Amino acid sequence: MSEDIRRGPGRPPKKRVVPNFERKGILEKPVRPQSRLEFSYDNPLIFKNLFIYFKNLKSKNILVRCTPTEITFFSRDQSQASFVIATIDGKNVNHYYASDVFWLGINRELVEKMFNSIDRSFLKITIVHRYDKPETLFFIFTDFDIDKECTYQITVSEPELDMDLIEMEKSISEERLKNYPLRWEFTSKQLKKTFSDLSNYTELVTIEKLGGDTPLHLYFQKFNSISYHEMYKSSNKINLTSTIPKSQVFQINVKIAHIKSLASAMVTDKIRILCEENGNLIFQSEMDALMLNTITLNNTI
């Protein structure tokens, strides 16, 4: 049977031509003279996924910090146990300009509705904040196939800063991250399954590792009832690394409800998990130019 007969009637699907966007990074001057902020990026779906994450965590208000080098989104989850800090470095996008350091406050539900209407036909997002309209943030989405631009004007405010939330940024500084004694990677599916299964039996789980080349352990034990032990024997399978001295044991107890809600909210396939001695956890994931950090405090147990 010939190839044409196997394919059946009708035209072959039209191949989409994707423009080649240059990533120029940080600009010294804006393209639009009135701009205080200009952000142009050829991956709008990254923003859609970020706001899906905020929605899944039931975040309410989002702080946006613009600096001459990067744009950062800060928020809390509904339980107030987890803090989200998502950063895009200006040098990794098509073009980026911010005149100085300033903050904007946006309502998550309002922006989320806008991103819900964005699909793969839009190949570029441009965000603009202008001196002459300080109460407005412009979102411009471009569909190059039919040369269409969709512009949304979202009302923003000069927010009251959540200093406890902003202070959490110190937990993910480059210097601080080097000193976390334990880190490993899970897929979002692994993370969700492990903590969903555990939640059927217990409220707390112990994370434990001996110093040296030893397995990672997750377990719980209820007196005269039930116990469970999960062991990861091959460190390379989960990219397990630690700085725990050979003679020591690293052990923390974690509230499962906090992790379960995060696991259900995740929008990336791979998650890096870092543990502090005080039991605080950091969940890191990357989406192209976006670095997403979620810090969960153990002292909320």
Swiss-Prot record:
Keyword Ubl conjugation: no
GO biological process, any: symbiont-mediated suppression of host cytoplasmic pattern recognition receptor signaling pathway via inhibition of IRF3 activity
Inducers of expression: Expressed in the late phase of the viral replicative cycle.
UniProt keyword annotation of Secreted present: no
Chain coiled-coil ranges: none
SUPFAM superfamilies, sorted: DNA clamp (SSF55979)
Keywords noted in UniProt: Host-virus interaction, Inhibition of host innate immune response by virus, Inhibition of host IRF3 by virus, Inhibition of host RLR pathway by virus, Late protein, Viral immunoevasion
Record text on subunit structure and interactions: Interacts with host IRF3.
Record's miscellaneous remark: Shares some weak sequence similarity with PCNA (Proliferating cell nuclear antigen).
Function statement: Plays a role in the inhibition of host innate immune system by acting as a negatively regulator of type I interferon production. Mechanistically, interacts with and prevents host IRF3 nuclear localization to inhibit its transcriptional activity.
Family note: Belongs to the asfivirus E301R family.
The protein's name in its UniProt record: Uncharacterized protein E301R
Taxonomic source organism: African swine fever virus (strain Badajoz 1971 Vero-adapted)
